[in-house]
Amino acid sequence: MSGPNIYLQDVTLRDGMHAIRHRVDPERVGAIVAALDKAGVRAIEVTHGDGLAGSSLTYGPGSHTNWEWIEAAVTNASQATITTLLLPGVGTIAELRRAHAMGVGSVRVATHCTEADVAAQHIAAARELGMDVSGFLMMSHMAEPAELAAQAKLMESYGAHCVYVTDSGGRLTTDRVRERVRAYRDVLRPDTQIGIHAHENLSLSVANSFAAVEEGAYRVDASLAGQGAGAGNCPIEPFVAVALLLGWDLDCDLLALEDAAEDLVRPLQDRPVRVDRETLTLGFAGVYSSFLRHAEIAAETYGVDARSILIEAGRRKLVGGQEDMLVDIALAIQPK
């Protein structure tokens, strides 16, 4: 094998929670983790879609607690690192400590792309615990490359081992991904890793992930069957297939990943995870991908087109945590 040595992280059981409204049995979590672990995936993120303490009326209640899901994951992982997500202001350092005590070895601390400063305490606390820590700059399309890189530099200064270009809206085209990764590489230390988190809303997630790696990204997020918010994340099966065709240093069992996607993940979907008129609108309008299910509920409740809600959300530049505003938009555009 040749080519770049990359760190593949699965997000089926975190970002993918949005696609199934955060509803899955711990037993299925354990089965998915076991399959990913056996297939050679290096890290597996597990939590409510909005991270530790994310279960709420705003984001959507989970069918089980994060602790039940994490316990199932840790129990079934023999090689992979179990990872979790923390949004400052939602999850707390106390919850991070509990997750670490349960066996979680890595955390991504997520902020809006221009608000890295709110992550300082949480990144520092994770480092004190001895955890692997990544900064997760969400909605990365909303900041120009230089501004985004300056925010990445802040996360590095707080102690992040890695900082992600996080395309939460699936809005970035391939050239814009390249620009942001290059901007990171220009300002970050050589030993600070770069990650890419892509969404499929414009059908670019695989291409964008490869482009990021070509520009120097090391960590790549992907998910079984593309399970994730909106049209989903970078689907792990075609990503691995192309990487293997290119001779990249990626020790994953493609057939096992295909089986896990078809047998364990697709049956969970009550709404297909795919590019369609609503999810394409997310990418076109630059809207947070996890708004999809909330917008569809508001559209059905108030008799409006979900796309109209999403387009207006994009015009208003809504960000994560403003899900309640989707109802306001639906009421405003409701036929009188």
Curated annotation (Swiss-Prot):
Gene Ontology MF term list: 2-isopropylmalate synthase activity; 4-hydroxy-2-oxovalerate aldolase activity; manganese ion binding
Sites where the protein binds Mn(2+): D15, H197, H199
Stored CDD domains: DRE_TIM_HOA
Keywords: Aromatic hydrocarbons catabolism, Lyase, Manganese, Metal-binding
A UniProt-annotated Pfam family: DmpG_comm
Active site: H18
SS bond partners: none
Gene Ontology annotations of biological process type: catabolic process; L-leucine biosynthetic process
Binding site for substrate: R14, D15, S168, H197, Y288
Domain Pyruvate carboxyltransferase as annotated: residue spans: 6-258
EC numbers, comma separated: 4.1.3.39
InterPro entries: 2-IPM_HCS-like, 4OH_2_O-val_aldolase, Aldolase_TIM, DmpG_comm, DRE_TIM_HOA, PYR_CT
Site (Transition state stabilizer): R14
UniProt catalytic activity: (S)-4-hydroxy-2-oxopentanoate = acetaldehyde + pyruvate
Family statement: Belongs to the 4-hydroxy-2-oxovalerate aldolase family.
Protein name: 4-hydroxy-2-oxovalerate aldolase 2
